[in-house]
Amino acid sequence: MSEQERVQECLRKEIRSLLISTKDGLTPQQLEKEYLLMVGSHLPLRILGYRSTMELVLDMPDVVTVCPYGDGTVILRAIPDESTKGIASLVAKQRSSHKVRNSAQKGRASVCSGPSSRRQVPYRGRLPPILPAVVKSELKDLLALSPILLSDFEKAFVRRFGRSFQYVQYGFFSMFEVLNAASDVISVEQTRAGSLLMLKKSVSEEKQRGWPAGGKMFTQPFRMKQQGSYSTGSPVAKARFSQPTSNMEPPKQILNVEKTFKSNVVETSRLNHTEKLNQLENTFKSVIAQIGPGGTISPELKHKIRFVVSKFPEGLLISKLLREFEIIFKEQLSPKKLGFLNVIELVGALSDILRVEFREGEQDLLVFDADMKPLPPAQSDKKIEVKAYVSSPPRNSLSTAAVKETTWDCPPKNRKEPEQKICKKPNLVVKPLQLQVEVNKSQRNLAMANHDIPPDAVRDKKLCRLPLLDTSTLVGVFVEYIISPSQFYIRIYSRDSSELLEDMMIEMRRCYSNQLVSDRYTLPEYFIQPGHLCCVRISEDKWWYRVIIHRVLGKQEVEVFYPDFGNIGTVQKSSLRFLKCCYTKLPAQAIPCSLAWVRPVEEHWTSKAILQFQKLCGLKPLVGVVDEYVDGILNIFLCDTSSNEDVYFHHVLRTEGHAIVCRENVPSKGFRELNPLALYTKSSSGPEDVVLTELGYPSQQHYFNEDREISPQSKESELSTLDEIPTGMPCLESVTIGDDVWDENWLPLQAKMGKGGDAASHLFTSSLGGKKPYPSCKEMPQKDWCFSGPKDVWDDSWQPSGLMNGVKVEVQKQEGLGAQEKNTGTTRIQKPPPVESSLDLSTLPKLEEFYSSLIQSQQSAEGSQPEPSCIQTPAKPVQLSTAALSASPMALDSAEKHSGSVESSPESLKNDFSSSHAITVFKDKSHGAMDQLSLILSPEHQISQKLYIPRSTATAALGAAARLATSRSLLHWYPSVKRMEA
C-alpha cells in the first residue's frame, strides 16, 4: 500500500468516526473544524489531490451521505459499516438537546446569510431583488482590471472601495443571488483554485460568434414616444421579439405581436395564471433585451444629454461631455451611478439619440446628435463611415450579420438604404456608433493594447546579456547549440545561473499552464513582429521558454530565437504568449562562443569536424577557460573532465586533422553574418548586475565565483623553459575567496581593491607567456613583485617531470627601465602519495583569503640563506603562478612550521627563495582592512611536495578546476592549518 492510499484509508476512518458521533450530522465547515480539534491538523486535501472538502466527501460515497437543505446548507451524515453499526444505533437513540438544535439552526442561518451579515434578514417575495445600478457599476469597475477569485472578492472589494460588500442591505440572502442578479455583466467559471469571477465580454463579441442564430432581426415591439413614455393604444405592425432562455442559447420562441394591446389581453386571459406570469416575464425580458442598457436611463436625462450635444453641430469631444453637462445644467452627470463603467459606455448605450465619429487628426471621439445630418467633409469618398460597436452596444440594433452585409458586402449604391430607414425611425432602432475606415492604425492598436493587454505584459522591453567574463576565468558550462567549432552557444552551469533558469522555467510552466492565464496572455497579431520578446510552449516537452521573434514566415508560423539556449526554431503564432515582466529580470543565459586558438584546415569546417565537436560536447557539463572576446564573441577553451584523463577539445581536433592550432583567435564568420543575441538584447549594466540584485540573488559577478588576471611572463624565462616544456595552454587556476569560500555574500575583488590599487591583490593566476607585456617602472607607481613560473601545457601527453622537476620560485624585480634580475631556488619533488586525515572538521579554523599553489621550478645554482623571510608588499597586486587549483583555501604541508618573519626591501629579496623554509605574504592590518595572505613552503618539500585543502566547512566541495588537479593526484586534503598573524 502506498503512502497516499494509507493516508486516504486513515482519513476515511476518522471522518466516519466524527460523523457517527454526531446525531444531526455536520456541515462541511463544521467537519473541518471538528477534524482540526480531534487530529490537530487540517484535512489533507492537497496531499490527496482534492480542492475542497465537498469534493473529498463526494469521493467517499460509502462513508458520507450528503443531505442538501432548501435554505442552501448541506449536512454530512455518516454511513456506518459492519464494525460501527452498533455505535451508530446508540447515537441515533440519543435525545437531541434543544441547545444543540438551536446552535445548528444558527449555524445554518449564518452560512446562508454570509459573513457580512449577523442580523436576521426580513422575509421577502419569491423573486430576488434587482441589483442597483451603482452596485453593478462598482462590480464592473472591480473586475475590469483582472478576474478575481470568489474567495478573494471581499478583500479585493475592500481594497478597491474602502468598505465591505454588504449584499444583505440590497435584499440578497447570499453571494450566489448577487451573482445571479449580475449575470448580465459577470460570469463565473470554475477553476482549480475555485470560482473565478470574470467580466463578461461585450455583446458585440457575442454577436460576432453567431448569436442570435439564423440572422434573425430584432426590432422594438413597443414604440417609444419623444417624451419617453410607451404608447399603449396604438398598434405596432409586424414587430417581433424572442425569448432568450439563456445567455448562450439562441431564442426558441418567436412571438408575433400583430394585433392591438386589447386583443393580446383577451388572448392571454384564456391561459392559466402560471402561463400568464411566464408570458409576462418573457415579454419584459425581450423588451429589456432589445432596449439595451440605454433603456434604464430616464427620458428627462436623455433629453438633457441630447440638448448638450446639439449645441455643438461640429461635434463634441466625448471627454468634454460631462463638463459641458455640468456647465449647462449645474448638476453632475455620473456614469457609474447610472450603472456604466465610463462615459464611452454611456454614450454607446445612448446610440438611439447620439452618433459617434472618429476623425483623423483627432485624439478623441466626437459625439453628434443622431438626427443632425453629418457635415459634407464627413461624406467624402475617402472617409466612408462604417458601423462598429464600442463598449456596450445596444441590443435593439441590427444583428451582426445584417450590419456586415449592409456596410461591407453590399455595393455602395445599396449602402444608403438602411441608413435612410434608420433615420426615419430614430426611436425604434438604436443606431450603432460609427467609426471611419481609415483610422490611424497605431492609435487603434494603442487603444486595443490598453484594453486587452495585461498590465504586466512585456511590450517593447529587451533582455540583458550576461556581463563579460575576465580572462582566464574558470567556468562550468553546457554547450547548448552547435553550428561549428567557431560558432556555438554555451550556458553557464552554476547555482546562480542554471538553477535560476530552471526555477524560472518551473514558475513559467506553473503560471501559463492555467488556461485562463494562457488565454489572457495570448499574443495579438499586431504584436507579432521581429524583435518582440515573448514566450512559447514546446508541445514535445510541455515547457515554456523565453523567445524573441526573429522572422515572420507566413500567416501561421514564425521563426523565434531562444535567448537562453541560442538556437532558432519555428513555432505556431497561436502558441505565442505575452511574457510577464517578472520573467525578464534574469539575463539571457546563452553566450555566443568560438573555440579558442583553432581554425579549420580548409576555409570552412567540414561536416566530420562539426560531428566530432558535437560528440565531444555531448549532454554533459564541461570546464571552460576564458581566453578573450573578439567582436563580442567569447573565445573559450573547453575540457572534458568526466573521465580519468582530461580531454582538451582543441587537442582532439588537431590530432584528428580537423583543425590547426594557432596562437591567435580568428573572428567567427558565422557570427559576423548573424548574431541574434547581440541584435535583440542589450548589454548588462556592469559587474554588479542590478537585475540580479533586484531578484535578491548575488550579483552577476558571482555567477562564476572567480576574478582573475594573467600574470605576465618575461621573454627570458620563456626562452629558458622552451626546450624543457612544450608550448600549449595555461593551467587552470584558483579563485578568490573570503572568510569562507562557500559564502555567497563575499564581495567582488574589484570592490576590495579599488581603482588605485591601494591593497594587495588576492589573485593567484597562471602565467600566459606572450599574452601581455610586463609593465615598466614608468607605468607602475609602485613596484610589482610577481612570482611566476614557466608556462604549463594543456596536453594529454604531458605529465609532471621526474625527480629533476622541482619547485621554482622566480622573483622579477624592476631595477630600471626594462631591467630584470632573477633569483631562482629549486627543490626536487616526487609524485605525492595520498594523505588521510582523521581530525574533526569542527576543530579546523576558517582561513580568510588564504592561498597557495603548486609551483613548477628549477633549482638555482646560487646559495641560500637558512632563515625564512617575510615579504611585506607595497600596495600593488601580488601574482603567483599556479597549477590547477580549486575554489577553496589551500596550503602546502610542512612538517616543521617556521614562523620567523622580517620586513625586507625589494633589494633584500635577491637570494631569499633558494632556501626559504616558509614564505608568508601578508599585508599590515594597520594600513588597511585587508586580511593576510599566507604561503607556506617548508623544507619537507625538498623530498616531496603535496598540495592540500583545509576543510573550512563541512559542506566544502571541489570546483571544476580542482577536479582537473585531482585527476593528476596533485591535490589532497590538508589536516590542519594555523592562521598566520601579522
Swiss-Prot record:
Q: Which domain of life is it from?
A: Eukaryota
Q: Which family does it belong to?
A: Belongs to the TDRD5 family.
Q: What is its main location?
A: cytoplasm
Pfam families in the record:
OST-HTH, TUDOR
Cellular compartments per GO CC: chromatoid body; pi-body
Write down what this protein is called: Tudor domain-containing protein 5
Q: Which organism is it from?
A: Ailuropoda melanoleuca (Giant panda)
Disulphide bonds in the chain:
none
InterPro entries noted in UniProt: LOTUS-like, OST-HTH/LOTUS_dom, SNase_OB-fold_sf, TDRD5_LOTUS_2, Tudor, Tudor_domain_containing
